[in-house]
Amino acid sequence: MFRAYGNNGLKNPERISGENPDLYTQTRAAVQQRATTTLKRNEKQKLAVQNDSVFQQVGIGESDSDDDNGGVRIRMSPHRYIDPDDVFTLPEVKKQNALRDAKIAARAAQATAYNTFPSVKSLNGCQDPPETSQQSTSRKRSASNSRSPSRSHSRRYDRDNGRQRSRSREKKRRKKERRRKRSSSRSSSSSRSRDRSSRARDTSSHTLMKMNKPAKYAFLTDEEYRTCDAYISSAFITQTKSDCENYTQGVPKKEIAKCRLSVKFIVGLEHNNILFNNIYGAEYARDKENRPFWEQLDRYLKDVPKETFFRYVPPVGGYWKIRDRVDLLNLDHIDDDVLANDSDNRKDAFTFELEQAKKTFSENVHNIDALIKVISMEEEMCRRNVGSFSSSNPAALAERHQEMVKKAIKADGRNAKLRLMKIELLIKMDPNSPTIIDDFKNLTITFPHEPMVWIKYLDYIQYDSNVYNYKKLKNAFEDCIRQVTGLTNGTLLSHLNAVNDRPLLRMFHLWIYIRYLKWMISCAHTPVVLANIQATFEYNFGLADVEKRTSTNSKEREVRLEEFWESGLPRIGDEGAVGAEKMLKQSEELSDEDIQKLENDDFDILISRTEETIATCLQAQRDVQISWIEVEREMMNIDARVKRTKLKDCELYEDHVDDLETCELWDIIPFDRIRYYEAPGDCANFDFVQPFLELLGVKFLNSTNCFTTTEQIISDWISNDSTVNFYKTPTYTEKKCFEVGNNILKFMLYNRLKLTENNPEYLDKTMVKYLLAMLVTEASEQEKKLNFHSFKLNLKNLVGTFITKHPDIFKRAMLSKITGIVYMEKFVSWWERALKEQEKVVEADERRKNYKEIKMEEGVVDDVKFDVILLKKDKERVQTIRDKIRDMIDIAIPKSTEKLIQSADSSLPTLQLHLYANVLRGRLSILNQNALEETRDVFCKEILGIHTSEFESDEALLLALDQGLNELLEHCKEKDNLESVDSIPELPRAEALCEALKVVAVFVFLDKMAFSRRAVDCLIANAITKFEQFEAKKNDFNRGTYEKYCDQIDLKFITDTLITFFSHKKHRFIYNENFKKLIFQASQAFPCDSKYAKMLGELHSSGRLQVMKLQGFTDSRNSILNAKRDQQFDPELETRLLMNSLTIMFSWMNAANRIGDAGNQILYKNWKREAANTRDPAIWRQVIRVASKLSQKILKDDAYTRARGQCTWALNLHFDYIEAKTVRKNGDLMEMIYLILEQSMGQEHSLFVTDEEYMKTQQEIGLQYSESGR
C-alpha cells in the first residue's frame, strides 16, 4: 500500500493473527487497549508531577540540595499543584494547543475505530478498507445490505432516530432545500438524477465514517524520509496545486509543484543556523519549539533585555540582579506588595521606570523634569514599537504631548525647556508649518540667554533643505551673535540677571561665532570669513591697549575701526600690518594714490593667475563640466584674499578688462557686512585667539580640535604612507587661509615678545604657546612632503631655516632650548613612523612574492608590480638619521655628569628639559643594542650617580634603579609644588616627565627582568589608575582651568610614551591586549584627539567581527552624546560625534579593502549612516565618492539627494557630485549652474564663471591652438 494514502499518513496498526475475530473478541481488545492507554498516561503524568516540582533559587555556587542548580525541592500536596503550562502559557497558545490535540485525537479515532457495541457500524482498522465511495443522500435502504445478528437492535436504533427527525421535520426540510439549491447550481437536473441513481447502486450496506484525506506529500515529513538520499527531494517539493486553466481547456489535470525553502542551513554552517536565520528568517515558517518546562524557564531567565535607545536613568537594580521567585501557591494571602516584589508580575526595567515617571508626574503636575522625562520615554517607547504588533502613531503621540506641554506652560510660562519642547512637538506634527520660524523668533527674544534655544533655531534652518534660505540663516546667526555679545559685555541689561553660568555663555558666544564662520567657508565665502577674522583682531589687538579696554569705550573703538577699515591700509593678517592704531599714525602723510599702490602687486598676481587658470582649464580638450569645476576650484583660492581697495580702480584692470568682465570676482567687503567678535571686557587671557587660528589651519602643540574644520581633520588623518585612507576633500582655500593665519600668529608672537623684552628670562605662557604653535605648524608642513619609507630628511636645514626666519627668538637661551627639545621630539616621532612604514613595505613585498611564486607553480605568468620598493640604502639612511638625532639631543641638552637631584643647576625648567631629553634617548635606543647599553648607562648616571658596570648583578641594578626613580619622583613632586610658577608652559610638568621616564626604564631594562610581563602589566594598571584620577580631577570644580589643562598635557605625554613602545614590532604582538586596553582608555579620556581615534580604528579593522564590536561600542557612546546634545550645550559634543564617526568609517574602510571592490556596498551603507548622524558636508563628500563606484543611480537618487537634503549650502558638495557623474548629457552643466544659483539666492557671490557661450568660445580657442600645434 502506498503510505501517502493509507491511514492518514500514519503507520497501520498491527493485525490480530488468525481468522477474523468475532464481536466478543473485538470488544475485549478495545477495552484492553483503552485501559492500557489510560494506565500509561497516568503513570507518565505522575512521573511528570514528580519531576516538575517547584524549585526556589536560594543561592549561587555549590549546594547540598536535591537540585544540581542549587535549588531545594519542595513537596506539595496534589490539590495545591498547578500545571506549569497553565501558569506560564498564554491563553491564545492554550487555545491553539487544544485545537491541535483535538484534531490529532480525531484522526487517531478514525484510524483505529472498533465496534465496541454490535449495533454501531464502524470501520475496523485491522481490516482492509473498502473501496471509497460517496455516501447516498437517500433515506432508502440499499439492496446490497446484508443482514446481521443484531438487526433488531439496529431497527430500534433507526426508529429512535426517526422519532427525533419527526420532531424537527421543518428544520430538516429547510436544510434539504438549501442543499438542493447548492447542488442545482453545480450541475443540471438530468446530471443530478443520474448521479443519484449511480450513488444508490454503489452505496455500501455499512454506515461509513467520513475520513479526512491526508495531504498527498505528507509522508515527506516523516522521520524515515529524513535520510541523505531523500533529503534533496524533500528540500523543495512540499505542496501541490492543480492547474485550473489546463483543466477548463480540456487538458488532463496537471499538478504543479509549489517550491518552498526547506533546507534551513548554509553550506559549511550545518550546525550553526544563526546566520541563515538572520538572512532568510522571514522567508520560511519556523518549526515550533517543543521544550520541557524547565528548559523554557531557564532560557527566559538567561534572556537579558537590551536597550535600543539611550535612557537618562539606569535600569532599576541593574540588568544582572538575581531575583527570587515568590511562592504564590503557599501564601495565605496575596496583596499588592507581594505582587510588586514578584519577578513574574514585574515589567521590564524600562516599562517599570516609565510607570514610575508617570506616577511622579501625576503626584505633582508642576514637576517640569518629570514631564520632560515622561515625554522622552514615551517617544522612546513609540520608537521601540515601530515594526512590532503594537500600535505606534508618532503624530498622535506628539499631539497628546503637546497638550500636556501647553498645560505645563500655563503653570510655568518662564521655562525655556517647555517652550522649546512645544516647538519641537509642532515640528513632529507638521514639519512644514509656517508658524515654526515665528515661534522660534519669539522664543529667542524671550530667552536670549539660553544656548539651546539658539542651537535648535539654527539647526532647524540649516539642516533642512525645505526650510533653508541664505538670508534667513544669515539673519539668524547675526541676531544670535548680537544678543549674546550684549549679554557677555553687559550691554543687554534686560536679561543680564537671567544668566546663571557666565563662563558657559562666553564659551557659547565663541562657539556660535566659529560655527557661523564654518558655514560661510562651506558656502565658498572665504573672503567674508577672512574679513571678519581680520576685523576681530584689529578690534581686540590693533586699537589701543587691550588690557585696559572696558565696555564704556566700545563705541569709540567701533568708530575708530570703521575709519581704519575704509582707509584701505594693511590689516592684521596682511603682509606688513602692525595694527590699526599704528597704521593710522603712519598713513597720515600718505595720499589715496599711495594707498592704492600698496595693493598693486597683489592685483597683478590676481589678474595673471586668473587669466592663466581660464586659459589652462577651459581651453583644454576635456569635458566642459570637468573644466568648469577646475576653474571654480582654482578661483576659490586665487580670489580668496580680502581686497582693501576696488580692483576696477587699479591701473592694471583697464588692460585686462575683456577677460575679467566675464569672470565674477569678489569686490571689497564693506564694514557694514562685517560681524567681528568682541571679546568680553573683563577677559584678559584671550582664549579666543587659538580657536580662530586653528580655524585658519594653524597647528598648536596642545589642540582641542573643537574649532578646526572637518576637512582639516581628514587631511591630518591622511598620512603619507601605504595605509588605506580617506579621500581628499579640501575646501580649496586652505593656502590663503593658512597664509593669513600664519601672519596673524607672527603678529601675536612678536607682540608678546615686545611686552616681555624687559624681562627676557620670564617665560610668558602666551608667548611660549605662540612660539610652539609656529614651530609645530612649520613642522607639519614639512611632514606632508616626507616619504617615510625612504625618509630623506635634512635635519640641520630644517632647524637652520627656522632659526633664520625667527632670529629674535633664539637670542633668549631658554626659548632656544625649548624650541630645540620640541623639534627633537618631532624628529623622533618621524623616525618611528619611518620604521613602521618600512615594516609595512617589507610585509607587502613578502606577500607579493608569495603570490607570484604560487602563480608560477600553477603555470601562470603574472607580472606583479611593486608600488613601493624598499632599498638597502633606505634602511641604512634610517639608522644614520637616528644617530644624528641623538647627537642633536646631546647638543641641545647635554648629559648630566651627576645625579639630577644633586645637580648644581637644579631649577625646575632645567630638570624638565633633562627628563624630557632622557625620554627621547630611550625611545631612540629601543631597537639598537649598542644604543641601548649607552642609554642604560646614562640612566644610571643621572638617576643613581654611578655606572651600570659597578653593579654585581642585574637584580641589584634593577632594585637600585627602582629606588632611585621613586626618590626622583618625590623630588619632582616637591619641585612642582614649590616652583610651579617657573615651570615651562605647554610642556609636561616634572612629575609627569618622571612617570614617563619610569615607563622608558622598564622597556630599556626589559630583557634583564625575570618577570617582564608582570612589569608591563603593572604599567598598564598604573596607567588605567591615572585615567581614573584624570576623570575625577576634570570634574572637580575646585581645580582651576589652567590646572586641568596641565593635567591633560601630563597624561597625554605618559600615554604617548607607552604607545610608542607598544607600537614597535617586537612588542606589538606580545603585549597586544595591553595595547588595546591603553588605546581604549586614551580614546575615552581624549575623545576629540584624532590620533587616538585613528589608532582605535586600526586595532578594530582586521575583520568584520572586530568592526562590529567597535560599532556597538561607538553606538553606545553616540547614544549618550546625542541625548546630551538635545538637552545641554557642550562645545566638545559635535567634535566627539565626528571622531566616533571617523573611527567607524576608517575601520569599515580597512575591512572592506580586504575584499576589493566587493566591499564598496558595505562601505557605502555604513558611511551613509555616519554622515546622516554628523550632518557634516565633508562626510557626505566621502559618501559621494564611494557611491560613484557603485552605480550612477545610487549616486544620484540616494547619496546626492540625502546630502543635498541636509547640506544644500555646501558648494563643494555639488562640485563633487558633478565630477563623480560619468554619464553626462548636454544641458547637465547649465542645469546644475541654475540649481546652485537658485539655492544661493541673496548671496554676495556664488560662482565665478556662469556664461555658457564664454566657455564654448574658450574651448574653440583651445581647439584651434591644438590644431595649429599639430
Curated annotation (Swiss-Prot):
GO terms for cellular component: nuclear speck; nucleolus; nucleus. The keyword Ribosomal protein does not apply. Residues 1-22, 119-209 are annotated as: Disordered. One of its GO terms (biological process) is regulatory ncRNA-mediated post-transcriptional gene silencing. Residues 119-135 have a biased composition (Polar residues). Keywords: Nucleus, RNA-mediated gene silencing. Pfam families: NRDE-2. Its main location: nucleus. It is found in: Nucleus; Nucleus speckle; Nucleus, Nucleolus. Residues 164-184 have a biased composition (Basic residues). Residues 192-204 have a biased composition (Basic and acidic residues). The keyword Nucleus applies. Protein of the nuclear speckles that regulates RNA exosomal degradation. Involved in short interfering RNAs-mediated silencing in nuclei. Functions with nrde-3 in the nuclear RNA-mediated gene silencing (RNAi) pathway to regulate gene expression via inhibition of RNA polymerases I and II during the elongation phase of transcription. Required for exogenous RNAi-induced H3K27 methylation. Interacts with nrde-3. Belongs to the NRDE2 family. This is Nuclear exosome regulator NRDE2. The gene is nrde-2.
